Each structure stands twice: as structure tokens, then as C-alpha cells.
Design a protein with these regions (language model features):
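C-terminal functional module detector
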Residues: 1-127
Length: 127
């Protein structure tokens, strides 16, 4: 499937020693905009046809790239960063089973999935 967005997740310890995280959208598909808070509020949408357990790559992007600089960086504080890449929605295995076996899944069963890929973290230490 095509890509919806690329995110950078920053983690750090606050003054009380509690872990914190912040998500930054760094690249988004389909001409959507990233707001001043570092997030894109517009969803990519979905082309999933649950009845046929299919989708089309008519939304999203085949590739995304970006240059990003942490707007909250403080050289005196440790942090970690990792990248998360999110695909457009596609049929979940339950949709394929429903079609193949001619059954009806209960309404509470998810029929789509949005797959994600994660990188290993990069650790910053002020020492």
C-alpha cells in the first residue's frame, strides 16, 4: 500500500522523572498540511472495499521524504527519537476471511488495518 505519513516520535524524561512522548508529522501525502503544532489533522481517507476485500492505491504516496529539525530541542536534556511510517488503510485478514468463506463478521470486528513500520531509536545524551 501507499504511504499516509512519516512521523518522528520524541521521548524524554520530565523534571519529575516521568517519561513523556510527542509525535511530529514530518511528511504527509496528498498535499495535506502540517500545522504549527507539528501534526496533520486531515486524515488520508480510505479506498478499502470491505465486501470485495480490496483497495486501490489512489490515495497516499508511493514514497515520502523530509528534512526535520526538532523545534523543541534542548542540548542540556537527553531524549530519544524514532521514525514511524504509516501506510494507507488496507483490508484486514478478517475482510479476506469474510469474503473467502462467505460469512458475516460481527460489527465489532475491525475490517481494515493501517500498517506501520518503526525504526530503531536514536538516543541523544548531553554528556
Amino acid at each position: 500500500p501507499n504511504l499516509d505519513r512519516i512521523q518522528i516520535i520524541k521521548g524524554w524524561l520530565d523534571k519529575d522523572g516521568k517519561s513523556q512522548e510527542r509525535i511530529f508529522d514530518v511528511a504527509v501525502s496528498d498535499g495535506r498540511k502540517i500545522g504549527p503544532d507539528g501534526r496533520c489533522k486531515t486524515p488520508v481517507g480510505s479506498t478499502v472495499d470491505v465486501a470485495n476485500a480490496s483497495y486501490t492505491n489512489t490515495i497516499g504516496a508511493p514514497a515520502l521524504s523530509a528534512y526535520w529539525r526538532d523545534p523543541t530541542f534542548d542540548a542540556t536534556k537527553g531524549a530519544f527519537y524514532y521514525v514511524r511510517v504509516i501506510q494507507i488503510p488496507s483490508p484486514r485478514w478478517t475482510a479476506y476471511d469474510q469474503k473467502r468463506f462467505g460469512i458475516k463478521m460481527p460489527d465489532y470486528v475491525p475490517m481494515t488495518v493501517t500498517d506501520r513500520a518503526y525504526t530503531s531509536p536514536i538516543w541523544y545524551s548531553p554528556n
